């Protein structure tokens, strides 16, 4: 019987990539629930307001009309309570993102994250990553692990959106009081949808990336990146994902984050 060689380093990388993918999925769920809660509450709030107006205007109306309006108000209240229980309660664990800011060297974080993305997905997808990294030995005071998760999610999303043979570019700069990372890729809807290709994110997350959205809303799979940036007092933006488009994802955080 031939023994299968064990590579502890490779196993550790796979475990870390799986952990980062699970974190991204957790924040994707949070974003989906938040969007559903908002979109369901808006019409219910309008209905509740109009029901109140009608109750005031029909205060002396036939009792059957008053009972009907009371029933409408009760139904609306029940729907709001259902949203609280089903959509809002599960978001408690991610609603407040605490960070632990400590000083660390930036370059090792970038090197480790790039190596992880290449190992876990890019090499298998035949997608190359060109990186432009800051010179010298810059350092940050931030939550290293959360930034690693955000950068991994940005890069992995770009690889997911890229066809075989394409190139993802990554640039990181430390300019004065701010550190910024930019990931650029060409979007292929076919690559996102192809079940034969290796993927880090599930089919729902990949389909949602291509959905039309308000300019202020991020793709759900990138919700973790936005939350990490905001928790550090920074910003996260990206252009719309559309087949054939060139998209840049940008994350910027202060070099001295509080926390």
Where is each model-derived feature located?
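Conserved catalytic submotifs in the C-terminal HATPase_c
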Residues: 100-105, 128-138, 145
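A conserved beta-strand-to-alpha-helix junction within the catalytic ATP-binding
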Residues: 100-115, 148
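Short conserved segment of the HATPase_c
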Residues: 192-206
């Amino acid at each position: 019987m031939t023994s299968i060689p064990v590579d502890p380093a490779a196993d550790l990388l796979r475990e870390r990539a799986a952990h980062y993918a699970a974190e991204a999925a957790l924040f994707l769920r949070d974003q989906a629930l938040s969007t559903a809660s908002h979109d369901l509450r808006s019409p219910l709030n309008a209905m509740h307001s109009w029901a109140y107006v009608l109750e005031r205007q029909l205060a002396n109306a036939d009792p059957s009309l008053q009972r009907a309006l009371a029933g409408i108000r009760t139904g609306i209240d029940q729907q709001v309570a259902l949203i609280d229980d089903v959509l809002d309660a599960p978001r408690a664990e991610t609603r407040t993102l605490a960070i632990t800011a400590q000083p660390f060297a930036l370059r090792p974080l970038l090197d480790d994250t790039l190596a992880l993305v290449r190992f876990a997905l890019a090499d298998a997808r035949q997608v190359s990553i060109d990186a432009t990294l800051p010179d010298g030995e810059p350092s940050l005071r931030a939550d290293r692990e959360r930034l690693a998760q955000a950068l991994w999610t940005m890069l992995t999303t770009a690889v997911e959106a890229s066809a075989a043979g394409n190139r993802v570019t990554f640039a990181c700069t430390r300019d004065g009081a701010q550190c910024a990372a930019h990931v650029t890729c060409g979007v292929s809807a076919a690559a996102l949808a192809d079940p034969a290709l290796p993927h880090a994110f599930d089919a729902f997350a990949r389909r949602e990336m291509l959905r039309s959205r308000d300019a202020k809303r991020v793709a759900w799979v990138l919700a973790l990146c936005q939350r990490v940036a905001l928790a550090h007092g920074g910003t996260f933006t990206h252009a719309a994902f559309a087949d054939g488009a060139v998209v840049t994802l940008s994350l910027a955080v202060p070099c001295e984050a509080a926390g």
